A protein has these predicted regions:
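A short alpha->beta transition loop at the rim of the catalytic pocket in nucleotide-sugar-dependent
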Residues: 76, 217, 224, 242-244, ...
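Acidic donor-binding loop of glycosyltransferase active sites
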Residues: 54-56, 221-236, 243
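A short, well-ordered alpha-helix in the C-terminal region of glycosyltransferases
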Residues: 296-310
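Donor-nucleotide binding loops and adjacent catalytic segments primarily
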Residues: 7-11, 134-226, 258-262, 267, ...
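Conserved nucleotide-sugar phosphate-binding/catalytic loop shared by glycosyltransferases and other
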Residues: 1-37, 42, 189-191, 276-277
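Glycosyltransferases and closely related glycan-assembly transferases
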Residues: 44-58, 64-80, 93-98
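Active-site-proximal region of nucleotide-activated glycan assembly enzymes
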Residues: 3, 14, 73-136, 145
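C-terminal alpha-helical cap of glycosyltransferases
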Residues: 309-328
């Protein structure tokens, strides 16, 4: 049921799913099926590698990376991992000792990985965001917002809907309207009906609400401030586009890596961090206050920009070529 099992074949590539799952850290007894699935995944990975005969195997940190890269290494195939977060997951830490190269998105990763293998490449982002040619006026028009909008808040509730962020926005719609804030609100599918009902009750608020934003380039260009979870790719986009942001890390991710990502920015003045537990009370009031301080927003965006690594995909490809001896 995972998205890639549908989208990868549609893009013209074969995909093989592995039955591997993560460990249950609260109830070790539930890990017996996990061990069985790991063995199945190793067997399937070995068969797939033998059939496909790749020149290199690349892992991006998910549990499925472990059996694939382990079997590739046994077969003498070069391996590379990419760590997207500021705090690596268990899989990449286990694989790091035997891979050829480690591409990272944050500085100071020597505490987790062998220093001689680390290359700072950044995280690849969507091509339409790397090469934007959109004016703010065009972006505002795209969302059918008033042309004079000068305090635009972009809220990214996630494709599935981050309930805490959405609830925080919903409970402060009148405050946003009274502060003269214009809202672009991506709710995710699970929250869109509730959000539309709430918006209808505050007609004085200038707002574009949708479950999914197709043109994120327009959304980022329009925004004066972004509210988002702290996933690796969202942060990479925010940094590359030099956007000031308030990050609300999801508490429901392995090893709390979103909090660590957000702290990596907040300690450098590149974002503000509000915890999920604090969000309903603090998130929108702080956003309203921040939008009244354009100079501080500019400074925050510039600090975020210093953490960006443009052309990350090209950097990673270059490392692949080096591992394969195609480029030195």
């Amino acid at each position: 049921g995972r998205m890639e099992m549908d989208r990868v074949p549609r893009a013209g590539y074969e995909i093989v799913g592995l039955p591997i799952k993560g460990l249950n850290r609260k109830n070790p007894l539930k890990n017996i099926p996990v061990a069985v699935n790991l063995v199945k995944s190793l067997i399937l990975a070995k068969r797939t590698i033998k059939r496909f005969n790749p020149d290199i195997a690349i892992g991006v940190g998910g549990y499925a990376s472990a059996p694939v890269l382990k079997e590739a290494q046994k077969a003498g195939i070069p391996t590379l991992i990419q760590e997207q977060n500021s705090y690596p997951g268990v899989t990449n830490k286990l694989l790091a000792k035997h891979v050829n190269k480690i591409c990272v998105a944050y500085p100071d990763m020597e505490q987790f990985f062998p220093k001689e293998k680390i290359i700072l490449t950044g995280n690849p982002i969507r091509k339409d965001l790397e090469h934007m040619n959109v004016t703010k006026e065009e972006a505002i028009y795209h969302f059918r917002l008033p042309s004079q909008s000068d305090k635009i808040l972009l809220v990214l509730g996630g494709s599935l809907g981050a309930r805490t962020i959405n609830e925080s926005v919903k409970s402060h719609l009148i405050d946003l309207a009274e502060a003269g804030v214009t809202l672009i609100w991506q709710t995710g599918k699970s929250y869109i009906d509730e959000a539309r009902d709430a918006i209808d009750r505050v007609p004085q608020l200038h707002c574009h609400v949708t479950d999914f934003i197709e043109r994120m380039d327009y959304a980022y260009v329009a925004a004066d401030l972004v509210i988002s979870r702290a996933g690796a790719l969202s942060i990479s986009e925010i940094c590359l586009l030099r956007k000031p942001a308030i990050l609300v890390p999801s508490p429901n991710v392995a090893e709390d890596h979103q909090t660590k990502n957000a702290k990596a920015l907040s300690m450098r003045g590149a974002a503000d961090l509000i915890t999920d537990a604090e969000a309903n009370e603090k998130l929108i009031p702080e956003a309203i206050e921040a939008l009244d301080r354009p100079k501080q927003l500019e400074d925050m965006g510039n600090a975020a920009g210093k953490l960006a690594t443009p052309n990350a995909a090209e950097h990673i490809v270059r490392q692949v070529e080096i591992v394969l001896g195609l480029n030195s």
